[in-house]
Amino acid sequence: MTFSFIIVLLISRNSGLHAAELKLATIFSDHMVLQCDKPLTVWGWADPDESVTVSFGGQSKSVITSVNGKWFLKLDPSKASAKPQELIARGKEGRKLVVKDVLVGEVWFGSGQSNMAMAVGSANNFEAEKAAANLPLIRYYSEASLPADKPQAKGKGKWEICSPESVRRFSATLYFFGREIHREVGVPVGLVTASAGATHVESWLSAEVQSSDPDTKAEYEAQLKAWVGFDEAKFKADYEKKLAAWKFAFSMGKSSEKDKPSDPDRMIAHIKGKGGPSGLFNARVFNLAPFTLRGIIWYQGESNSGLPGSNQKHLYHKQLSLLVTSWRELWGDELPFAWVQLPNFTAPGEGWPRIREAMLKALELPKTGMAITIDIGDEKDIHPKNKQEVGKRLSYWALGTVYGKKVPAISGPLPTGSTISGNSITVYFKHTNGGLKSINGGPLAGFQIAGADQQWKPAVVEIKGDSVVVTSPLVAQPVAVRYAWKDLPDCSLANGAGLPASPFRTDDWPVPQVKK
């Protein structure tokens, strides 16, 4: 998908916007941050065939609008600046729009489900974080449009200046990441987010991408059919029947308050709030592109961990890869892209290990990174509160790879291959940063080894430089090894910087089915 094609797509889908007046895309508003050192795309609407001029930082560029009034132009790159400036758009008959208090710095987009949406107000040590949040050079924009069945050109959001009063609403993961970038790079930081709890990755992928890929087409069509077929009236009628049955059982002493059917209005709002396949891409991502960014952060996967196991174990890997490549195409830029690997948490089946594996495999894409969080989750809370460390680990990757800064490590250890010799398997790692080590100084736990019978046995592990040698007295001829392959695994292996190793497996045996 070329940049010119993206422009045509955006122009052709103006979703009912009638350009009777000069307008800028919603994200171009007071207190915004523009990306430094890259050409800046600015767009909006006016009358057809109208000349529009945009001025910023001592430069002016003009463009003639399309037949439906949409316009795009590119400003030359600007240096980072904490000095408030104005971005001005001018049209015919003296029409003018002025965006005030515009800074230039580093802009990152964060998206995903509830762990990306989780606010600073819900994270660890909020009172201390609140007191330290007088950081006016950090700005935050949250896109909050309702899910839609078609791509929407107009967004819903506003820029906020970081302060002790506003920070409680900011995405915790994105804020703690951005704060590290601000501290280390020393320029203004803009944080743009679009996220929604309990959402599948399918909600964030375009219909075109999902329906045209042979691996995702069937799943997309099944979800679309279920979404289109959702009958609100029938849903409420079914609730009334269930409620009547519960009342009768309750009166007979055969049921309790906890068995009462859920409020249908809340359930319907939850279903509609997530949207169908592509619903959040249409509403919250499409309108942001091609706003100039430095990179993207993704935190999602929990909801996809319940998909069927062995016959679709590849699907999240494919979907995440499509998300990266299709969003890059939409923006017309091979943006650096990192995600948070799912942390330790008590969940049924092998869904979480499978999603972690998919995330590990997706690192094959260029300019990607992953924060391994297998040691900082919460076994009972799917929303772990230590988002400070999540943001810091993401920042290590960005600072080390995007900005060329010296960091303790850009990642925890990642497996690069393995060899079998007699009764042992040697696994090799990269990102060891001073050598592998045991997190607690004791024997390495969480490793299992298996022979051709595919029966996993506890393993004995010896560290040798940047590799580990795995054996078991119960397996004479091993063929495969795995590490931390549980929802709530033993986490024992780290690099010299103390960052944990990613879970992995060397086999490709079918994964047991995971029930929804």
Predicted regions and their residues:
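Cell-envelope and extracellular/periplasmic
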Residues: 20-516
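Sec/Tat signal peptide C-region and signal peptidase I cleavage site
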Residues: 14-19
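Bacterial N-terminal signal peptides
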Residues: 2-13
